Amino acid sequence: MHESNLWVAWTLRSHDILTGALPSGLGLRDAAALTLIESHPGCSVDWLPARVGLTQSGAVRLVDRLESLGYLARTRAGRTVRLSLLPAGQDALREWNQAREAAGEEALSGLSPAQREQLTALLGLALSSTQRRRVEADTTCRLCDWSACRTCPVDASVEEP
């Protein structure tokens, strides 16, 4: 039970720090959508809902909002609507990634470099040991800076290509 309490407390503390770092006007789903669209150029509106935890209509409203803010563009390719970030969306994502890094520093500030290294190894092990489908992996990493991981432990856990 104590282990579970520690895990929950750490998760909630990290969540609170992370949400406090969001740039003004952005929510976690906004940041997730921008992150996923940037890391999967040309993804479709249909691809997004499962990865950001919304229904199809909710994802369309999210895309509508981000488009109205000038963050993304839709391009029709036959029956598919492709998404791409505009410069303002890239700027918002860059601001989010910097804020996310600062939030990570705050969350880990009480640990020594050796303890951080140990925690990183343990988190990587925990993430890689849970088998998941590709969509679940994308969902797990929806707020990650995808270019920062040389070897992603979540990708290593994917059961399917």
Which ranges hold each PLM region?
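N-terminal leader segment of winged-helix/HTH proteins
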Residues: 1-25
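N-terminal helix-turn-helix DNA-binding core of bacterial DNA-binding proteins
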Residues: 16-57, 137-140
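Charged, amphipathic alpha-helical coiled-coil/dimerization segments
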Residues: 64-117
